[in-house]
Design a protein with these regions (language model features):
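Non-catalytic substrate/cofactor recognition surfaces at enzyme active-site rims
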Residues: 1-335
Length: 335
């Protein structure tokens, strides 16, 4: 058999961290309402790349497609059912065009991304965005989720088909294949004692307001999530100041693949893709059993909100910089 590579574009990801002017400062808000008068713009970029690796049998017939899109499949976010989300539509539409091929989805760096355009949906979802931002319960937003998945699936399918028309003429039967797996460690994001003490006081206040023998509601538990995170981080940083996790890198032909265990913000991926020796780089997030959480940029930490605070991040921007340098070095060593 053989393989072939292709790079295309599909508009799937949108930044999910709009920024607002609050008391003269820029503040970020995960899933904020962009129709508010103090909306300033987005905290960071989006990546509309679509990276593909196609597999072929000995008769040069297509057998599968690995598709890397830097966006989580979360159209159905905050609903209590299992779904393949837009990837189900990608598989259906691709198989209608290319036959019963195997489709392997990969999520590129997308910690600050989501598949919905907040500028477009904010006007009709003002109440829903408040619930969505709180992440405390299910929320039915004012748009057709199935239709969104079908449209996203169509855009990805178009990119895969465009790439296939090029790739089928560039099949490699003996590509260079090299691989490496190693343990990487980067600085653990630490917290200050004053913040831990304040978090502990807030938790005790919630406990005091709860009837004896009673249970916290789901919303109350979620509101304690951030403060519990401060306590847990303080305990962890007494034991270590490094976060360790497995990294897998491999080369197939002119492409490099690198994993990480984070919801990695797009800017880090851009740096790795631009600076590595590989002509094409697949930066694959959330791809080990290590629980890395989000890995925000300094701009995100300064902006605040979920996805940039200690409770949802094991590593901060300093660790992100180190991840970039070490990952580039590991990929380049394969060339």
């Amino acid at each position: 058999g053989g393989v072939a590579l292709a790079h295309e574009y599909a508009a799937v990801a949108f930044n999910r961290r709009p920024q607002f002017l609050v008391n003269g400062k820029r503040e970020s808000k995960m899933y904020g309402d962009c129709s508010e008068p103090n909306f300033l713009g987005y905290e960071g970029p989006s990546d509309h790349s679509a990276d593909m690796l196609y597999t072929f049998d000995e008769q040069r017939q297509l057998t599968g497609a690995l598709v890397c899109i830097p966006c989580p499949s979360q159209v159905y976010e905050l609903h209590r059912f299992i779904s393949a989300d837009y990837w189900g539509e990608v598989r259906t539409q691709l198989r209608a065009e290319l036959g019963n091929i195997f489709v392997l989805p990969l999520c590129g760096a997308a910690g600050d991304q989501n598949p919905l355009d907040l500028v477009r949906i904010s006007k009709d979802n003002k109440r829903e965005l408040i619930v969505w931002n709180a992440q405390e319960t299910e929320v039915d937003r004012s748009f057709d989720m199935l239709r969104e998945c079908q449209q996203i699936g169509g855009r990805i399918c178009d990119a895969v088909l465009r790439g296939y028309r090029q790739a089928r003429n560039e099949i490699q039967t003996r590509p260079v294949f090299r691989t490496n797996c190693f343990e990487m460690d980067v600085p653990l994001r630490t917290v200050e004692k004053a913040d831990v003490d304040a978090a502990s006081a807030r938790i005790e206040a919630v406990k005091a307001a709860c009837p004896a023998g009673g249970r916290l509601t789901e919303a109350q538990m979620i509101r304690c999530f951030e403060d519990i995170g401060y306590l847990n981080r303080w305990k962890l940083q007494q034991e270590t100041t490094r976060f360790t996790f497995p990294i897998f890198v491999f080369r197939i032909g002119a492409a490099a693949f690198a994993t990480n265990p984070f919801e990695l913000y797009v800017d880090y991926s851009y740096r790795m893709k631009a600076r590595c020796k590989a002509r094409q780089a697949f930066i694959i997030q959330l791809s080990s059993n290590a629980k890395g959480g989000y890995l925000p940029t300094q701009i995100a930490v300064d902006g605040g909100s979920y996805g940039s605070k200690p409770v949802s991040t094991m590593v901060g921007p300093e660790g992100g910089d180190e991840l970039v340098e070490k990952t580039i070095a590991a990929m380049d060593a394969l060339f």
